Amino acid sequence: MEKDKSFLGTQPVGKLLFKLSLPTVIAQIVNMLYNIVDRIYIGHIPGDGSLALTGVGVCLPIIMIISAFAAFVSAGGAPRASISMGKGDNGSAEKILGGCFSMQIVISAVLTALLLIFDRDLLLAFGASENTIEYAVDYMNIYAIGTVFVQLTLGMNAFITAQGFANIGMVTVMIGAVSNIVLDPIFIFGLHMGVRGAALATIISQCISCVWVVAFLFGKKTILRLKAKNFFVSPKIILPCITLGLATFIMQSSESVISVCFNSSLLKYGGDIAVGAMTILTSVMQFAMLPLNGISQGSQPILSYNYGAGNSERVKKTFKLLLAVCLTYSFLLWGLIELFPQGFARMFSSDAALIDFTAHALRIYCAVLCLFGIQMSCQMAFVSIGSALCSISVAVVRKFVLLLPLIYIMPAFVADKTMGVYMAEPVADVIAITFTSILFTIQFGKAMKKLEAQKKGETK
């Protein structure tokens, strides 16, 4: 990879997007295995696999919050670093990198303390029952210790990708994923540790990835380097980053809030089997979202660099290509889920009743997944050009204005109240995608006209 980032403004957009997105997509697919391999193994533990899977599923909202805090800093910091580099200001970009690194360590310490102190109370509030609470506590107590590894791996890897080192970003994920896949069966079955073994395998794998990421950013191959002189949390540097990252934080942390609401409603109407099915649905949706995230993240350095350089034509061309690729993927995945839902369910459980229940719920829950590429493309474009307010608006409308109330409203309109809870997802998505499309058409057009006007002013 070139040390000079000007290639982001000169190489053909299609070739460049493919070169940056493919490694990231591969990394996200591998990362999907990293995230769900625990659940696959746990769901097949002899005797109590279904309850253990449900217990670990209750931990997912907390795991989402941990990941969301990594994005809170890096999802805004990485694009701002790219924009600074597009302007030729690598010094400011390195200050952003160093400040975000320190901020994530502080956040990790706070989260770890809170999770270890309030683990049982949080898990009960998040939908654990008397049958599943012990499995959830066993998993979370160990996972919480590795919070700092999650924060630094996810957060700092975003800065690696933002510099155009997509291959290095892919290796980061693959190191952790392969380690987890190898260690899981050893700890779960070989050492008979059950869910505790799954959690231990996960944090060891995250530690290995963390060492790789930090070593790279301290090394000589990176464009932006971690330097001790930049390890201070300056409001002037951090506040713009977390403002821009707030939309991604809301998107990811709201998944946790939504998961809690889903779990509580499903426990009320359908019992443990409905919550267990939700664990599988969440895993399948991660499968759907992670490659889309990978494609979007591959486009971010191109969009941000060219926006910073004032090249509106390349920004528009990159977005159109991003939208086409995301929609194509969304349609293909939607078709597979609707045609073969039981195949996805069998990946996570051997319980026939849970498989049948999940297959029916999956078709409802993913009914409009085919259109979600629009949402992801517009969201990334807003973030890449530094449009924090629009990014936040899109995130808030979909999750809090629409989905959250619909979880409680939809059961009142259908006879099968459990399936009514699942129906909230597609109904919210249709409305949210419509809103996002309208907002994007207006605001992105304004941003491009402003960029073109600035460019004309500079050439006079």
What do the predicted segments below correspond to?
Residues 1-24, 81-148, 192-245, 303-368, ...:
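Short alpha-helical transmembrane segments in multi-pass integral membrane proteins
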Residues 19-20, 58, 181, 243, ...:
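Hydrophobic alpha-helical transmembrane segments of integral membrane proteins
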Residues 25-79, 143-150, 239-306, 326-334, ...:
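Transmembrane helix-bundle signature of multi-pass secondary active exporters and lipid flippases
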Residues 31, 35, 39, 43, ...:
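Juxtamembrane/transmembrane-helix interface segments of polytopic membrane transporters
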Residues 33-36, 44, 50, 84-87, ...:
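Helix-loop interface residues and adjacent transmembrane-helix termini in multi-pass membrane transporters
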Residues 36-40, 113, 155-159, 178-186, ...:
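Alpha-helical transmembrane segments of multipass membrane proteins
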Residues 53-113, 150-169, 277-335, 339-341, ...:
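Small-residue-rich hydrophobic transmembrane alpha-helices
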Residues 74, 143-161, 169-177, 198-211, ...:
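Short runs within selected transmembrane alpha-helices of multi-pass transporters and secretion channels
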